[in-house]
């Protein structure tokens, strides 16, 4: 969430400055970047807070269930990111067709933000899957030690 929070903060700062220093579609591009990343910053804050409250008492099955749920969430988010990119491209095109600086600027911004989020979500998914493989390689073993049985995970 530090990556998302850093992206959001840099976009809020540059978007605010860019809004006041730009004209035409660039002004609207920066306006949308600022607004979009206020939401991203909130999401990053909740995510960072949630990550600090990890329940270390979870058993193997519960941890695996949580990981699978998170994987599904990342894949759903990736689908939404593609919708953002497509919607942004449509707005951008409509802005060009109608000579609307606002639609052009907003469209460019949404394409950029959706592309970043797609890269972010896919990267997080791939990292998460690599960690899940390590968890999945652990298997339950029951061995006889001579004095009793040893159950290892």
What are these regions (language model features)?
Residues 1-18:
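Start-of-domain marker
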Residues 2, 22-41, 68-75:
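Transmembrane alpha-helix entry/boundary detector in multi-pass membrane proteins
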Residues 13-18, 38-53:
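Canonical alpha-helical transmembrane segments
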Residues 16-22, 93-97:
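Juxtamembrane "helix-exit" motif on the non-cytosolic side of transmembrane helices
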Residues 33-36, 80, 84:
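Mid-membrane cores of alpha-helical transmembrane segments in multi-pass membrane proteins
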